[in-house]
Amino acid sequence: MRLIRALILGSPLGICAVAQAVYAPIPDQEQGKDLTLSLEAGITYNSNIFGAATDAISSMVYEASPKISLNKSLTDQTFFSAYYRPTVDYFDDRPGEKTLFSQALDARLAHAFSQTSTLDLTDAYSYNQNPEALLNGAPVNTDQTLQSNEFDGRYTFAPTEKLGLVLKARSVYYDYTNPTLGDLLNRFENLYGVESDFALLPDVKLAGEYRHEDVDYTNDPSENNKHSDFLMAGFDYAAGPKLSASLRIGGEYRQYEGLSSTTTPYAELSGKYDYAKGSFISAGYTYSLEETSDPVHFSDEKVNRMFVNIQHAVTALVVASASIDYEPAVLVGRPLASDPSQVQGDINENSTHAGVALTYVPTKSWTISISYDYDLVSSGIASRDLNRSRLGLSSTVVF
């Protein structure tokens, strides 16, 4: 089971981020060697293992997760990294199968054609029998296995000293192995975009961006498919190594197969402040249309997402972290397939995800963490409600 671990290391704004160097930071435990082996083991109390709105089932969960990582410079200009991580979860009180197996395989290839031109390709495959994000409103069943793959590509170049261009693409495939869930939710999400930035000041870059997205469900009805065009502008601000901010605002024009098209605003805002060594605070806000877990009754979900992350180095060996993610949303109703003359009304749904963690690092190759995570969903449809707490203790050893 993958807990939030209290700290959200990434954000929905990642696609807007300024291109990073080819040699992205390698975790401290993996520096200085090409091949790294590690083992994580932990125990967690989960108050609602199926994410049920009522009659929640709780259980102790025991986890073991070995990992093999490779970080290698193939040439002076080419870097390759990959890892494979299988995970075994055992549930004391889970109906049906008590032992679940998951695995993740990630790979990255980065090449610098010159000091101003880089290509970065990543692929992430996941097979998860115990997914972190359970499906609101889905009938409770013992199989929510999700298989997914995400491919990302970025080509960054600078025609002039002040002008930068980025070509980007992302393709994601979601495959629920349960036939009932798969018929509703299996899909491809493909995103393509071009971004340009101009260095107005040493610490300020103006940015403009166009994106196109296709969401194609693998099963009928085809009216679940949609196609979007985004146009946005904003800036990236970096006042030295400690303070940074990014803003994108614009609009999305979405066309549906079988429904009327719509135009909505789009916004992304984030900021980060490193106030001490090993300590920072970051926060952000996004507004967007997203896919729902019930495409039969709802076409989209209008989501306001606000998040705050804090990491504080208590001592050289102890790190505390906390995060909160609040998402007030509106599920947009659609005509019912059984009777198109009837339209499902819009539904308000608020989600809160919060966590805290304390991590002890006695040596460079050993960490011990205790964490608490809380998930709350309050929906206008009672069957979509969720209340879940998880308390975990884990340890990781790097060999």
Report the location of each language-model feature:
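Cleavable N-terminal export/targeting peptides
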Residues: M1-P27
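Gram-negative and organellar
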Residues: Q20-F399
